[in-house]
């Protein structure tokens, strides 16, 4: 997928394994993986961080192949899913950081421009999540309350 606010085409991406079956050397069962996911979610980790830990420490390449469900669906079934979608959360976090930078460096025109781009991405993503009913229809991004969302 191409980049939104940059000239790069973004063609590089990781390839999923061809076989969708569980490797024979993996000794973890579906329930073991789910318990591990619950434990990591209770520590406050995001779904992608959970996936990285499971991949690097436990040898689970794809949680979906082992459990039959994605990490976020497993968390939703247990009520441990984050309130905001992860990509939206990170964009808001970035916007808060840039706004904090602009408070200290008022003349930084480039940062001001980048903040506009970040916030336009936030609005676009929020509109998408409202149509998919992930966010409530009255949810609105406001820069004044954004720091409370990511705190």
From Swiss-Prot:
SMART domains recorded: Ribosomal_S13_N (SM01386), Ribosomal_S15 (SM01387)
Annotated GO biological process: cytoplasmic translation; negative regulation of RNA splicing; ribosomal small subunit biogenesis; translation
Numbered residues of crosslink Glycyl lysine isopeptide (Lys-Gly) (interchain with G-Cter in SUMO2): 43
Sites bearing Phosphoserine, chain numbering: 30
Matching PROSITE patterns: RIBOSOMAL_S15
Post-translational modification comment from the UniProt entry: Ubiquitinated at Lys-27 by RNF14 and RNF25 in response to ribosome collisions (ribosome stalling).
Modification type N6-succinyllysine: residues: 27, 34
Assigned keywords, A-Z: Acetylation, Cytoplasm, Isopeptide bond, Nucleus, Phosphoprotein, Ribonucleoprotein, Ribosomal protein, Ubl conjugation
Cross-link entry Glycyl lysine isopeptide (Lys-Gly) (interchain with G-Cter in ubiquitin), positions: 27
InterPro entries: Ribosomal_uS15, Ribosomal_uS15_arc_euk, Ribosomal_uS15_N, uS15_NS1_RNA-bd_sf
Modified residues (N6-acetyllysine): 27
UniProt keyword Acetylation, yes or no: yes
Annotated GO MF terms: mRNA 5'-UTR binding; mRNA binding; RNA binding; small ribosomal subunit rRNA binding; structural constituent of ribosome
GO CC term (a single one): nucleolus
Residues with the Phosphotyrosine modification: 38
Location within or outside the cell: Cytoplasm; Nucleus, Nucleolus
Function: Component of the small ribosomal subunit. The ribosome is a large ribonucleoprotein complex responsible for the synthesis of proteins in the cell. Part of the small subunit (SSU) processome, first precursor of the small eukaryotic ribosomal subunit. During the assembly of the SSU processome in the nucleolus, many ribosome biogenesis factors, an RNA chaperone and ribosomal proteins associate with the nascent pre-rRNA and work in concert to generate RNA folding, modifications, rearrangements and cleavage as well as targeted degradation of pre-ribosomal RNA by the RNA exosome.
PANTHER family given in the database record: RIBOSOMAL PROTEIN S15P/S13E (PTHR11885), SMALL RIBOSOMAL SUBUNIT PROTEIN US15 (PTHR11885:SF6)
Quaternary structure and partners: Component of the small ribosomal subunit. Part of the small subunit (SSU) processome, composed of more than 70 proteins and the RNA chaperone small nucleolar RNA (snoRNA) U3.
Database matches in HAMAP family: Ribosomal_uS15_A
Similarity remark: Belongs to the universal ribosomal protein uS15 family.
Protein name in UniProt: Small ribosomal subunit protein uS15
Organism: Homo sapiens
């Amino acid at each position: 997928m191409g980049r939104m606010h940059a000239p790069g085409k973004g063609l590089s991406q990781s390839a999923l394994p061809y076989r969708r079956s569980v490797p024979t050397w993996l000794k973890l069962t579906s329930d073991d993986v789910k318990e591990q996911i619950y434990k990591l979610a209770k520590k406050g980790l995001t779904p992608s961080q959970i996936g990285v830990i499971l991949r690097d420490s436990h040898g689970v390449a794809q949680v979906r192949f082992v459990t039959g469900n994605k990490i976020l669906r497993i968390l939703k079934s247990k009520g441990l899913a984050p309130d905001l979608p992860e990509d939206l959360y990170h964009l808001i976090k970035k916007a808060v950081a840039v706004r904090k930078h602009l408070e200290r460096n008022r003349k930084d025109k480039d940062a001001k421009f980048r903040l506009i781009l970040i916030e336009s991405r936030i609005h676009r993503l929020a509109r998408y999540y409202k149509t998919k009913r992930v966010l409530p229809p009255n949810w609105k991004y406001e820069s004044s309350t954004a720091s409370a969302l990511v705190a």
